[in-house]
Structure formats: C-alpha cells, structure tokens
C-alpha cells in the first residue's frame, strides 16, 4: 500500500473526465464523490476501470447533465428502477448513483432505499476499505473522506465491516462471500469480530 498526500492523490484524478464531472456537479450544486473500489485500488496500486460516483442528489440528473456537457461522444444509459445511470465516453465508463440509505427486512434481500447523505452511503458499504470516498467538487477536489479507518485497515491488511458485522451481513448475506473473496484476492486478514459474525451467519448465504 502507498501513502499519498492530497496533492499526490489529486494526480490520480487528472484525466479530463474527472474535471468534467466536477464542473457538472458544481453547476448543479451537488456534492460528488468517487467511491469504493476505484479509490481503494489507487492506494493498493491495482489497476481499476470501475469508476463509481456518488452524488448527494440525483445520480441520474447528474449523468444526464454530464452527457450533455460532453456532447456527441457520450452515451448515457439510465436504469430508473435502480436509480442509477452510466456514462460511456472515449473508452471510460462511469456509474452514477444518488447517496442513499438502505435497510433490509430479515426475509428479503431486496433493500428499502431512501435518499441520504454521503455518510449514509458509506455506512451501507460492505467493508471499510470500500467505504473510502474522494471529493470531486472544485472547492474540495482530491479530499479523502475515510470515516471508518479504511486507510488504517489497508495498512494493516485487514477486512472489517464499517458497522456491526451482524448488521452488515444481515443486510446482505452475500457480503460474506465477498469478505472471503477479498481476503483471498488481496491476501488480507479477516478481523476477529467480522470472522466470528461470518461464522454465526453463514447459514443465511
């Protein structure tokens, strides 16, 4: 894992598409963050093509506005049922979603979704290393938001859930499979509380 200053982190967002996203977000008055695996993989020095952007507001409105700004070379796909949209532009794909809160009923894997804040969105992430976010708005461009100690967990090579693991796994039992996959792929250790919860809840997969 590498450690980066904010100025060094900004260099990883120097491609023109990020500047266009930032300008679109500022024009719309929306907070906008790159989240999840793309941010994680910068610090782990792993290649990553999946760019996921969380908008505090409508991800679909953001994607449509970006598509108009980019012009004829952009292709926008809207998935209204999921509240998400994708913009393809010159070989780059960016997924947009509005920040949201999710809750699950015990007998269902279908989430109850409400609009939320960035913090709400990070709360619902599976693991701390995937809850990292980097702001794209001009005033805070390149600022890392790490509320759960994901950077420290990467340093310690640890897989840990942002919330009580029983809640995280109960919300979506398939996260237990992802936990094992990440630990295997990255050579990380599963935090004791997380592992014990995984053992307790394994029948739910």
What residues fall within each predicted segment?
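Catalytic cores of the polymerase beta-like nucleotidyltransferase superfamily
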Residues: 1-205
